[in-house]
Amino acid sequence: CTSEPYQAPGTKRMAQRLAQLVDGINPEENIYLSAHRVAWLRKRPPAKSAVLKLSQQIELAKELLQAGESAAAADLFQTVRGQAGANRLRTRPSLEEMLALSYLRLGEQKNCLDNHNLASCLLPIEAAGVHKDQAGSRSAIHFYSEVLRKSPFDLTSRWLLNIAYMTLGEYPHKVPEQWLIPPAAFAADYEIGRFTDRAPDLGLDALGLAGGSIMEDFDNDGLQDIIASSWGLSDPLRYFHNQGDGRFAEYTSKAGLTGIVGGLNVNQADYDNDGFVDVLVLRGGWFGADGLHPNSLLRNQGDGTFADITEESGLLSLHPTQTAAWADYDNDGHLDLFIGNESSPQQNHPCELFRNNGDGTFTDIAAATGLDVIGFIKGVAWGDIDNDRLPDLYISRLGEANLLFHNDGPGPNGQWHFTDIT
């Protein structure tokens, strides 16, 4: 028999904590978890009136489409379309638009995913990127043409109609002239050549949602490895080790990372100065009230494994975020950590500045330094703007002015402070 790979106690605790988050999902409130919402909507009792029943079916069809069940979505939209006229039901987007999108997505799934190749879904689509299974795009063309006959200035539908023809190898010569987007529109000011997707050849063609990725030599063997996250709550963090022969092998389990899931972003830093680069996983971004997720600080043990030390390091907090940046703001030789959290009118989630205590632990001093910023933070970056050898901080906020904070250094009492000089 084979023994399970070693996993640090902190990693086991974090894996349990993350599993509990999945168990506590509320699909009624969280609009991003479409697969869970599909299951919830299917259990909902049907409305009494015919119009409300159709509205329920449309809502379910939209969630099916967002959950990747494009064929089921198209079938349900077709059913509703057959009944909508008699009930004088109008929708925005129209049922024809939703049908067109469902079939276009179905074509992508049947070809770009199920029969993926190096030219799949790369614009302009040509040669090997042309769909072999053409049913989805044929149906999409039918419905986009119907939409454009009614709304000839619908630029979104016009664009997607051209894409549908492109997937069939029939662009531009078969696109109706009045809806053609000419090839010149795709021309670049500078020809830089065509990039080649090497992921399948290298063992890196992993599926996932939005997420982050970092390339770093995690085991100091002189070769760059890759760690990638995926936003889905049950999606694993994946560690791809560079084999040195032009390929990567997945070492996620071997590295003790089983159960470390989710994460809209990741970044890296050697926070403890031991010569091995560590990893920070950021979670909860865009989830709003459902985004009270812990981040993960994964300490590189130097033996090919990582340990989740979030709790023991003092970094455990529950806020939605996707952005953070490391810098030694006080020049003590230890990297500190700023985390930009996402506040909303319903909930405040102040930003955090964790001072590295130099003993493997951190202390949040954001309030004391003037960096407990409120906003929907989407990006943060350190940089010395005035050459005083002290890192200053730039913060990007969604829907509000961005902020620039000057590092004032320590005051008379030794307390460091930042001033908003935006």
Give the location of each predicted region.
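Short glycine/acidic-enriched loop and turn motifs that connect beta-strands
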Residues: 232-234, 285-288, 343-346, 400
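Short coil/linker segments at helix-helix boundaries
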Residues: 24, 79-93, 101-146, 170-191
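Blade-edge motifs of beta-propeller repeat domains
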Residues: 173-208, 241-261, 298-319, 354-375, ...
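Beta-propeller blade termini
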Residues: 202, 211-220, 241, 255, ...
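N-terminal leader/linker segments that initiate helical-solenoid repeat arrays
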Residues: 1-55, 59, 113, 177-179
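Structural register within alpha-helical repeat arrays
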Residues: 53, 60, 99, 106, ...
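Hydrophobic beta-strand segments that make up the repeating blades of beta-propeller
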Residues: 213, 225-230, 275, 279-283, ...
